[in-house]
From Swiss-Prot:
Organism classification: Eukaryota, Viridiplantae, Streptophyta, Embryophyta, Tracheophyta
Metal-binding among keywords: yes
Catalytic activity: a primary methyl amine + O2 + H2O = an aldehyde + H2O2 + NH4(+)
Protein name, UniProt field: Primary amine oxidase
Binding residue positions for substrate: 316-327, 402-407
Domain of life: Eukaryota
Signal peptide stretch: 1-18
One Pfam entry name: Cu_amine_oxid
S-S bonds: 155-176, 337-363
Bound cofactor: record note: Binds 1 copper ion per subunit. Can also use zinc ion as cofactor.
Entry-listed glycosylation sites: 149, 252, 382, 576
Gene3D superfamilies with a match to the protein in the record: 3.10.450.40, Copper amine oxidase, catalytic domain
Amino acid sequence: KFALFSVLTLLSFHAVFSFTPLHTQHPLDPITKEEFLAVQTIVQNKYPISNNKLAFHYIGVDDPEKDLVLKYETSPTLISIPRKIFVVAIINSQTHEILIDLTIKSIVSDNIHNGYGFPVLSAAEQFLAIDLPLKYPPFIASVNKRGLNISEIVCSSFTMGWFGEEKNSRTVRVDCFMKESTVNIYVRPITGITIVADLDLMKIVEYHDRDTEAVPTAENTEYQVSKQSPPFGPKQHSLTSHQPQGPGFQINGTSVSWANWKFHIGFDVRAGIVISLASIYDLEKHKSRRVLYKGYISELFVPYQDPTEEFYFKTFFDSGEFGFGLSTVSLIPNRDCPPHAQFIDTYIHSADGTPIFLENAICVFEQYGNIMWRHTETGIPNESIEESRTEVDLAIRTVVTVGNYDNVLDWEFKTSGWMKPSIALSGILEIKGTNIKHKDEIKEEIHGKLVSANSIGIYHDHFYIYYLDFDIDGTQNSFEKTSLKTVRIVDGGSKRKSYWTTETQTAKTESDAKITIGLAPAELVVVNPNIKTAVGNEVGYRLIPAIPAHPLLTEDDYPQIRGAFTNYNVWVTPYNRTEKWAGGLYVDHSRGDDTLAVWTKKNREIVNKDIVMWHVVGIHHVPAQEDFPIMPLLSTSFELRPTNFFERNPVLKTLPPRDFTWPGCSN
């Protein structure tokens, strides 16, 4: 699951998450280079590396109290919020939770974690682990037995999960691949070998060579453009993107202003991109109105569906085990983002706490081409009425690459008040080698599809869970489910025999808000029951969910115990500053005792409270030959749409953009 990435040097318009002095940032700003260095110094002063084995596994902003942040938004010069950093470090094989106050440059607390699970893996220890087999005599013997060249082998580390063991060490599986004749290593696995490495001991603690399956051929697996030969695919014509009036958005530090929207962009080494303090200007009320306090992907659960020794452990939690922020890669201008995009750089950290510059981590751009609204009126005699408005969206994009998969993550904003988080998957299938070359040779369950000779693409899922802390016109919100009900007409009062109507229920507790989306239609809305429109409706925002995908593992299966937050498509909890990670704070080798599913057993009240919605977006992936050797985008999305939030269509008075013609060109 671990793969290397190079930080590309690219020319573009940039903003950088870096501020000096330390105390001038917004309370939710990402950690800067200077802050990473300060944290490194403070911790190393207490635990000198000369006589301590110290590794930083998470360095993140300790969320300030929400009420202080909201006061800061209105009176930044009157509110002073201490800048606190939360650190998870492994020191002499013990996991420490260290809280640092950078305002006074000292450690506030230092506690040892004695529970289940381990922190996010570091890149440094994975580098060391994947090098172990190449120097391990039994593995070298297995390679020679297969007639392979050890110099053409690369390895990758994979988290192992938990399968009922009483005790766990910080171990990973190490799988190896052939890089001979192709850089597409994941489609050329060396199967039949089990390698387990202990990350604390940094040695191989278990090794088995079970059987020999063919290594899939390198033929037709190369994806680099420089290695392609004719005939080429469909020709793409160049497109010039030009905004003669300049971009419609402004980036001021970490604050983005666009059209009627204003929001804050944050970045965390575990969550990746974080959207905060999203508010929209109401033209009729002449003020900005709060919508979303914070939104991000809390976890990604990827269980593979092969129970054999080769694959059973592959049930990954990409955010909690590898870190979405740590796995964010540099975006490629004119490829990942359009020519008119602007880029934002940021910093992540290494295992020794050193800041690492990440160029082009985020891009911001406007998208054109859709229709905002339109109507052609033909019902008025002797009049021809045609009105149409162009839709212009604002997109915020990052790409997270965890091993073989690339996750293209967007947040889209529309002037109509919509927000649209979307996910697009590309990259390489997880391939299992086989001696089978044709479908007719399959005589038993292979747990996937034969996508090429000697290559099985394993069935698997992708379950993303979004953390959505709504603040609809304030923090006191409720969650409503409006069901659509069929009514049969029995009194003969109409020529119709049936119609449908609605029935609304307000969720009183967390149990009421556990929603499985299926055939029964329902509207799911977060409302502010204290604020109503002129006609008496509660103001709110509606979730238009992604196409539902439900877990198919049994609830007593160990991976599903750890990933129980996928048991429902929607959850609602009261806001709790410490409940950030749906799979728990410590996910590697976790046992499912600190998850969203466990928290909600308290069945807390959620009526007219500060509440958080959690939405699970899932994809069941049955591989096909078109996914090989590299996948075209597989995408899904959901929408957050104002529902009785405005008095009327908020973009009714939007004027069409001025037509622009290039000099020397004609229509």
